[in-house]
Amino acid sequence: MSQQTTIRDTGEAAATNAPANSATSTSTPDNQPTPLDAFEVLLITGMSGAGRSHAADCVEDMGWYVVDNLPPKLLIPLVDMMTTSGSGSGSGVHKLAAVIDVRSSYFDELAAVLGHLDDLGVKTHILFLDASNEVLIKRYESVRRPHPLQHGNRLIDGILEERHLLEDLKERADWVIDTSSLSIHQLSTKLYETMLGSGPTTVAVHIFSFGFKYGMPIDADFVADVRFLPNPFWVPNLRELTGHDKPVADYVLSSKGAKEFLDAYEKAIEIALEGYAQEDKHYVTIAVGCTGGQHRSVAMSEELARRLRAHGLNVTVSAREQHKRHSS
């Protein structure tokens, strides 16, 4: 079976999905070159069927730049290209994760490559995913695919050969995770606990206000309709203001039903976020709408964000219709 090296397009997507408290990033400020002694390399390896691909997804969410199926011999030139040691200006990337297995070309050169990286002062880490032979057999049988080292023999023969080839690498791994009894979500939690020293960070929340007259949002997990509140648009001295202005915010938040709605919605969101965290969902979008997206929805979005932040949540707020005026 042929393999293809894949460089994932992380960019802003990885930065957006990364946990708020992970303190990792895919680039240095203003995309400046990264010196070698500030560069880190993570090798994701282990038994086929033990969860390498999912581990790579989690690591990507932590802010690492991930490359799939990278031949070990290409690690040095890739690091060289991404740092100030190369002839270019560097890429700004300072955390590179490479998924490597025994099928990678020149796998036997990996030890020498790691030694070279150590000599260069590059911090290297190895994450090794493992599982029992019995579990690996069940996983392969469930997907009805042959083991990459099976070569027409029994499945257990391929597993045992791979285990033998990876024995030394497992011995020098920084982290070894046995996934035999772990679900996908449990593996995610284990990775965060192991690599970051804590469980998954609180789900990041983005709240945005919008106007129903401009269309329903298609990217929201929750949509709140606050058109039941009195409309400041019909108050002459408030019409030209927005929900960001205190007079409008005071008017909206003191309206009958506003506090009761916020109390109930805040509680519902808290319950949902707890469930999302257990299901390994890292990002939730809440849309709050009124007629034109200028007054009621803006004020309620800001107040909801304030309340959720008080619970220690990472919350951002935006106004979809901020460039549209004269209707709410």
UniProtKB/Swiss-Prot annotation:
HAMAP family: RapZ_like (MF_00636). GTP binds at residues 101-104. ATP binds at residues 46-53. Belongs to the RapZ-like family. SUPFAM superfamilies: P-loop containing nucleoside triphosphate hydrolases. Keywords: ATP-binding, GTP-binding, Nucleotide-binding. InterPro entries: P-loop_NTPase (IPR027417), RapZ-like (IPR005337), RapZ-like_N (IPR053930), RapZ_C (IPR053931). Displays ATPase and GTPase activities. It comes from Bifidobacterium longum subsp. infantis (strain ATCC 15697 / DSM 20088 / JCM 1222 / NCTC 11817 / S12). Gene3D superfamilies: P-loop containing nucleotide triphosphate hydrolases. One of its GO terms (molecular function) is ATP binding. Residues 1-33 are annotated as: Disordered. This is Nucleotide-binding protein Blon_1085/BLIJ_1109. Residues 13-29 have a biased composition (Low complexity). It holds the Pfam family RapZ-like_N.
